[in-house]
Amino acid sequence: MEKLAEEIINGRRLTRSDDLEFLLTCDLKKICDGANKIRKTLCGESVDLCTIINGRSGKCSENCKFCAQSNHHKTEIKKYDFLDPNVILKDCKKNEANGVHRYSIVTAGRALVGSDFDKAVQAYKMMNKECSINLCASHGFLSEEQFVLLKEAGVTMYHANIETSKRNFHNICTTHSYDDKIKEIKLAQNAGLKVCSGGIIGMGETWYDRIDMAISLSELGVISIPINVLMPIKGTPLENLKRISNYDILRTIAIFRYINPTAYIRMAAGRTYFEDGGIEIFQSGSNATITGDMLTTVGNNTCQDKIMLQTLGFSI
């Protein structure tokens, strides 16, 4: 693994034509150490912190099996319309003061349209004017014109998870397709936005699905890859799935670093499964994280995250 890490540092890139079976069987410590070396050499010691606000909750038409916000599932989440832009601005300012680097509004639903989209643009313009934080957005399937409007409002990155591999996608969602996701990502890129896209592990997929997802993201040129671990929510079709081990989480992080050596490998939901906040995650190739709460689940405390990461040698 050390030799492969050196080759990747020197420019080699893993592709679909490579036999990647060894990534699943090699010693865990060796693959994690190699991934950490790649991260340190190609990405440096800086860490990227982002946080999100649930800008519109619930009542989603899509049937993603993992999601508590779908109208297809009976869950006990708060449902509300788009937040007042002033509420969003206040929350953004608070997170910027806490040292967070990126801030994103995330909305439930297939797409954000009409007056809700107008409110989102207004909120981004207000944040762009009054804050210095990097602005990200996650609003489902938008038109090319909408992506341009977001960019003009100050948004620099668009979030659109592919969730899993192409071959496994139909097992997770049937109201939209994997190809719909890819089209969305390319529209955002064509509008001049960077893209944040990853997925969820622990939904019953195989290791080959995870590798396939990592390669697809590399082929798309995605620069920020959030990796979520399924946190089963009562009322969703996946509520009774047994969670994957911490060892599997670490191997997944390392594999994604080997395949996407210069990207932000962003640990998202699931870090609370680690008692120490996920120290080993950041020694296995990760150099970014969502801090604070997730959309419908509890996350990690930002101040504690900063202390932990600085102790590990990262610069905030």
From Swiss-Prot:
Enzyme class: transferase
Residues passing through the membrane, by range: none
Entry keyword Iron: yes
Function, as annotated: Catalyzes the conversion of dethiobiotin (DTB) to biotin by the insertion of a sulfur atom into dethiobiotin via a radical-based mechanism.
UniProt pathway annotation: Cofactor biosynthesis; biotin biosynthesis; biotin from 7,8-diaminononanoate: step 2/2
GO molecular-function terms, A-Z: 2 iron, 2 sulfur cluster binding; 4 iron, 4 sulfur cluster binding; biotin synthase activity; iron ion binding
Keyword Manganese (UniProt): no
Domain Radical SAM core: 42-268
Keywords: 2Fe-2S, 4Fe-4S, Biotin biosynthesis, Iron, Iron-sulfur, Metal-binding, S-adenosyl-L-methionine, Transferase
Gene3D superfamilies: Aldolase class I
CDD domains, A to Z: Radical_SAM
Subunit structure, interactors included: Homodimer.
Free-text remark on how the cofactor is bound: Binds 1 [4Fe-4S] cluster. The cluster is coordinated with 3 cysteines and an exchangeable S-adenosyl-L-methionine. Binds 1 [2Fe-2S] cluster. The cluster is coordinated with 3 cysteines and 1 arginine.
GO biological process, one term: biotin biosynthetic process
Protein name: Biotin synthase
Co-factor requirement: [4Fe-4S] cluster; [2Fe-2S] cluster
Reaction it catalyzes: (4R,5S)-dethiobiotin + (sulfur carrier)-SH + 2 reduced [2Fe-2S]-[ferredoxin] + 2 S-adenosyl-L-methionine = (sulfur carrier)-H + biotin + 2 5'-deoxyadenosine + 2 L-methionine + 2 oxidized [2Fe-2S]-[ferredoxin]
Residues binding [4Fe-4S] cluster: 60, 64, 67
Family: Belongs to the radical SAM superfamily. Biotin synthase family.
